[in-house]
Amino acid sequence: MARFFRRRKYCRFTAEGVKEIDYKDLNTLRNYVTETGKIVPSRITGTSARYQRQLARAIKRARYLALLPYTDRH
């Protein structure tokens, strides 16, 4: 029987040595937002707790400044 092997999740920001997540980096932020506009949880993405907090803060700032939409209907 073939067993399904699940890849280990890792934090991309830790691997790349990112110090601070920038709210103006929309290409990165869009990878962590669903089509409906929700922030993807760290258990799905594998992001560490520290960077998940920075990511949420950056996404909320980008939404407030109208760089990212709150929902998909805009």
From Swiss-Prot:
One of its GO terms (biological process) is translation. Belongs to the bacterial ribosomal protein bS18 family. GO terms for cellular component: cytosolic small ribosomal subunit. Binds as a heterodimer with protein bS6 to the central domain of the 16S rRNA, where it helps stabilize the platform of the 30S subunit. InterPro entries: Ribosomal_bS18 (IPR001648), Ribosomal_bS18_CS (IPR018275), Ribosomal_bS18_sf (IPR036870). Keywords: Ribonucleoprotein, Ribosomal protein, RNA-binding, rRNA-binding. GO terms for molecular function: small ribosomal subunit rRNA binding; structural constituent of ribosome. This is Small ribosomal subunit protein bS18. Part of the 30S ribosomal subunit. Forms a tight heterodimer with protein bS6. Pfam families: Ribosomal_S18. It comes from the Bacteria.
